[in-house]
Amino acid sequence: MGHSKQIRILLLNEMEKLEKTLFRLEQGFELQFRLGPTLQGKAVTVYTNYPFPGETFNREKFRSLEWENPTEREDDSDKYCKLNLQQAGSFQYYFLQGNEKSGGGYIVVDPILYVGADNHVLPLDCVTLQTFLAKCLGPFDEWESRLRVAKESGYNMIHFTPLQTLGLSRSCYSLANQLELNPDFSRPNKKYTWSDVGQLVEKMKKEWNVLCITDVVYNHTAANSKWIQEHPESAYNLVNSPHLKPAWVLDRALWHLSCDVAEGKYKEKGVPALIENDHQMNCIRKIIWEDIFPKIQLWEFFQVDVYKAVEQFRRLLTQENRKITTKPDPKEHLKIIQDPEYRRLGCTVDMNIALATFIPHDKGPAAIDECCNWFRKRIEELNSEKHQLVNYHQEQAVNCLLGNVFYERMAGHGPKLGPVTRKHPLVTRYFTFPFEEMTVSTEESMIHNPNKACFLMAHNGWVMGDDPLRNFAEPGSEVYLRRELICWGDSVKLRYGNKPEDCPYLWAHMKKYTEITATYFQGVRLDNCHSTPLHVAEYMLDAARKLQPNLYVVAELFTGSEDLDNIFVTRLGISSLIREAMSAYNSHEEGRLVYRYGGEPVGSFVQPCLRPLMPAIAHALFMDITHDNECPIVHRSEYDALPSTTIVSMACCASGSTKGYDELVPHQISVVSEERFYTKWNPGASPSNTGEVNFQSGIIAARCAINKLHQELGAQGFIQVYVDQVDEDIVAVTRHSPSIHQSVVSVSRTAFRNPKTSFYSKEVPQMCIPGKIEEVVLEARTIERNTKPYQKDKNSINGMPNITVEIREHIQLSESKIVKQAGVATKGPNEYIQEIEFENLSPGSVIIFRVSLDPHAQVAVGILRNHLTQFSPHFKSGSLAVENSDPILKIPFAFIASKLTLAELNQVLYRCEAEEQEDGGGCYDIPNWSSLKYAGLQGLMSVLAEIRPKNDLGHPFCDNLRSGDWMIDYVSNRLISRSGTIAEVGKWFQAMFFYLKQIPRYLIPCYFDAILIGAYTTLLDIAWKQMSSFVQNGSTFVKHLSLGSVQMCGVGKCPSLPLLSPSLMDVPYRLNEITKEKEQCCVSLAAGLPHFSSGIFRCWGRDTFIALRGLLLITGRYLEARNIILAFAGTLRHGLIPNLLGEGTYARYNCRDAVWWWLQCIQDYCKMVPNGLDILKCPVSRMYPTDDSVPLSAGTLDQPLFEVIQEVMQRHIQGIQFRERNAGPQIDRNMKDEGFNITAGVDEETGFVYGGNRLNCGTWMDKMGESDRARNRGIPATPRDGSAVEIVGLSKSTVRWLLELSKKRIFPYHEVRVKRHGKVVTISYDEWNKKIQDNFEKLFHVSEDPXDFNEKHPNLVHKRGIYKDSYGASSPWCDYQLRPNFTIAMVVAPELFTAEKAWKALEIAEKKLLGPLGMKTLDPDDMVYCGIYDNALDNDNYNLAKGFNYHQGPEWLWPVGYFLRAKLYFSKLMGPEANAKTVFLVKNILSRHYVHLERSPWKGLPELTNENGQYCPFSCETQAWSIATVLETLYDL
């Protein structure tokens, strides 16, 4: 049963675009695409660029996937196409519906990291990474001694900042040459190359078990890069990006202003070189507005030269033969067209629009002058608008500039740069200027000289709050003009364009750079990822993955939105996103981040191997500090390093840090200005030695222990996480293994405030740890030692020598110095709790416990897991085989349960409240929530199926399980109280629950679910094995529908059916528990749950026989079907079968159609069951041999079934007329007196069965008015007297069948005899059959021809091309109502219909009546139509009160089956195209039933819905005939 291959299912839904949804999968997983309900029955093709096995990945190359249908059945519920994922990266899929693209998304497959000489796997959650600034590693021959510090500290991954040649600024991220190793690493006598780096990386991987990754920087290059001067097209310069010219002019003006301020030229105007107050800032603002902006007149770049434009306009007006070249759009107004070259006053307007707008009234000079003046005025207005727009940009530019000045010169947290100089100008320059300085005006002339302008390049930077998917240097963005860029003056922004052809050199250069990186490193960190154009990063990573298929891709994203993050993660296949612990403002937030970034809750449910693919959050690389973060010692305190790093390391994801954190370097190590080298490893170094470190330095010793623990927890499957905020400074994090049920609990006392200057309470709250503490894995305290305080060293990046950690590893609790004492308490019979009292948990301390379940519980879990392996291999780990368990557990559950009959399975799996109450029980009630729908396992499974995928452990259901054994005992006791195999199954549960009760309460929901789901799926398999091959080989949908047969068919304490003839073979018997007598126990069929499930209201003739073919014959339950047919046959009276059966003795013979449904079932039985015709000879024990006899006991008078059938036909031809027994309020409190008079007969002319009167309702549409207030009491809403269309169809089907049987001499009668006017008249079946055939379409079809002479009431026709609902009703207009009943006649007697007419009528029904799940019971165009059924409403509305509209609009489910079956039948006659379309339609409609069935806690289909498929609270939640007719439709498919 249990397969261990991990399969994920992605449901495709129409128009669902999931580009922003992250789907993460692992290599070795299978991904199945399946059709969601909106796409079932449609032609869908799935395409993906995931390559064929053995092919290399090509992002542009898509292939279609083949559909697989495991059951080869027509419905689409199981159809899938799949990918076996064996390759890491990001892969796209999309799907077409027909030829239209309908939806799509991405899947990300994680890389597998291999490390060590044996190439073992390093799981992503085990990664412990440390960042090194490459330039601080010193000469290459000294790297090993410096990197050894990371190895000794327990890191297994090193991240190097770029190793390439640096630019002038010496920033680690400003590279002068992307292809060359930084020459700083070489010695004068020894030049090192990439292969030397590669050898070291390989050595670290093989010998140290350490992987290496490095940065790739795609956005910019150093301003002094030689290659950018040779290829200026690779940057945004004033030739390829002329839109930057105004920004450049402003930039130069501000540079000159800055130089003047530095030289003191603005001292008089209030701006000295040293800016230190708001007044000086205001003076800068004034100078810019009064001196700079008026000089540079930026608005001119966006304006039109008025004089030139007017002259051109005048010339055009005076041309004699001018033609408007293109007729302008009348909606177009005159507007300024931007000069693409951005010359001053170089913009233009469309003269065609101008000429069409300003038209002179004659050709005279005065008129032309007037026109030109109007034109001039308009141009001046447009220019003025541009002036205002530029003013608005200038305002923002001044604000941004002053904000920058404030940060750099005055802010407390800023760099405080001091006086303005050329080295530290007033503001950073936005553009390079590799020329001699000149005056502003001379400089400006260069921008129109392409040979010089191409070297005026834009710097890169970042824009606060900008959309990361927009490139801020492209046209349309005003970031440079508005000075919104936080600029990196050492780097030039690179301009890739949209494809390699747009800038061939740049793409090739960067590809080569990427390939060098991927050749030597296992992974890359995408620097500044959010500003990297996605298409560029995709192209580069594709190149990298060709060389390094399991490339580990790390990135930092500052998009501010998870949706945007996901776009980058999914498109680029990012493996881990860097998350910063420094973003936490207190310990509480730090704990929240641990919970957010990984793991599942402790005690989580076991998820099946085959399950839906759920959206994920990106895998995290959780860093206690990144190289960009400010120093935590400054922000928090040196005492916080140890507790915060412990909290971060306890997260169930990758973790990381930056070199310097462990050594307690008390300042940020600057990526730009730091030139000292890192310390080396020396086990014997003294604290005063600034150039060397060992385990006594900083927190290195503790870091080593914590890193080892992090890797162990990841590798050993401690995937469950619980975070407890003990108090404002103490955070406890639990990592739990769901297979061995061991926990590791860390308790960290953070020190966000310096303990020397802030108050921390001596009192530390007690802690309760559930389970038995095996050991203290680590206890560590941050302490001061007696050495010289920190002094910054000249050569080495040194830390604080006076702070270290005192650590003790793997000790017993009694040896701990942090824990005072530990008491043991028990919380319940199986709850083992250790109470921890702390003595020395000072700020900056941590203690980590390893905790097991108490031994007793550990054994119980092991035994449970051992017995659960029969259901799933998942439970092998942690399982324990013992000899002395209950003997019943030694037998496989499937073996015990295989003896259950389907009738017994009804009791084990189902039974609603009313059925259970009959047996003296009831459904389980969960306090503060609700009762379960079923007493059997399905009641529990319906709730678990809701909460398991969401892992909703806080649900009241789980609370109830954790609080006590009531539900557990309910499950087993309910079954044990019954007899036979059911009790055996109960004993198996009891034996399993014996162990379940011995495990900690927090684990009970997960194991209770595991026991139940194992048993439940086994029981379903046992049910299906007892059904027909159609079900056994059927789709999931077919199988789940077939369970409706188990759900509806059962045996209660009291038999619902009258007793069968004692001479009948194979009748099931049982021993009555009270009388100890043998009694019949035939299965009866409930009409619906919960309303029609027990007592006399369980069995109804009509419901039973509409449902019988689907629920019993198609599922192969032939014996049960036979018994029900014969039991009802025994109750025949007046030639009718009762509707309300009432065990036969309380039967009501008030319906005209049940007998015809019964006959149809006999026909179906004979055709579908092997040797089915034998039923005709079976004995029927007549309860009422004559209309007036008292009920006779079984066996008093037996008759073969064929005689009973003949009696029905005889009585109808003779005519049936009687008054119901006990007529009056005692049998029907609403019926008027005349309604109790029952009539039925056959029309001599037409052969149609007719009956009923205006005050009764003898068909399935049997609503009787009940409201005195609305005055509809005793009035049927739908009398349908006369000849109802479905009864005519059913009688035709029976007559035709009896005719066939009599010809074959199987049925001994070929005619019926009646007395008419004292004479005996015979009517042959042949004649009767012919009469109906000849008259049906003539009288029932409403012709398209208004002059059709067959139409008695042409004035009542309001829809043509349909079939009437009845013929000869007492209210003639009722005949003409459009209802779904004619489709029943189409299915049982298709020979009555002409294919074309039938097809037209079906099309109308589809358009007017078909709802999402059911068929409207009345044409919505009818004036009494109302689609919402409310049985509780009592008002003055005659048509609605007390649910009078039950069949006047609400959408009933069972007719949908007949509609679809009719459609399928006639589509075949209409040709292959119509048939194909119909098959699609049927699948699509049924997919909604599938969804409803899956989601319904009742696991059934309802009786009806309100209009448009809305839920109706008055409907049965699951109805026999609804399930049956849908199953019949699938059978026909």
Curated annotation (Swiss-Prot):
What name does the UniProt record give this protein? Answer: Glycogen debranching enzyme
Q: Which residues carry this modification: Phosphoserine?
A: S64
Location of this chain's protein in the cell: Cytoplasm
Q: Where is the catalytic site? A: D527, H530, D628
Q: Which reaction does it catalyse?
A: Transfers a segment of a (1->4)-alpha-D-glucan to a new position in an acceptor, which may be glucose or a (1->4)-alpha-D-glucan; Hydrolysis of (1->6)-alpha-D-glucosidic branch linkages in glycogen phosphorylase limit dextrin
Q: How does it assemble?
A: Monomer. Interacts with NHLRC1/malin.
**Record note on modification:** Ubiquitinated.
**What does this chain do?**
Multifunctional enzyme acting as 1,4-alpha-D-glucan:1,4-alpha-D-glucan 4-alpha-D-glycosyltransferase and amylo-1,6-glucosidase in glycogen degradation.
- Which organism is the protein's source? Canis lupus familiaris (Dog)
**Gene encoding it?**
AGL
Return the CDD domains for the record.
AmyAc_Glg_debranch_2 (cd11327)
* Record-annotated disulphide pairs: none
Superkingdom of source: Eukaryota
Q: Which UniProt keywords apply?
A: Cytoplasm, Glycogen biosynthesis, Glycogen storage disease, Glycosidase, Glycosyltransferase, Hydrolase, Multifunctional enzyme, Phosphoprotein, Transferase, Ubl conjugation
- EC numbers: 2.4.1.25, 3.2.1.33
Annotated InterPro entries: 6-hairpin_glycosidase_sf, AGL/Gdb1, AGL_central, AGL_euk_N, AGL_glucanoTrfase, GDE_C, Glycogen_debranch_met, Glycoside_hydrolase_SF
- Belongs to which family? Belongs to the glycogen debranching enzyme family.
One GO CC annotation, please? cytoplasm
Provide the GO biological process annotations.
Answer: glycogen biosynthetic process; glycogen catabolic process
Q: What are this entry's molecular-function GO terms? A: 4-alpha-glucanotransferase activity; amylo-alpha-1,6-glucosidase activity
Question: Could you tell me which Pfam families the record lists for this protein?
Answer: GDE_C, hDGE_amylase, hGDE_central, hGDE_N
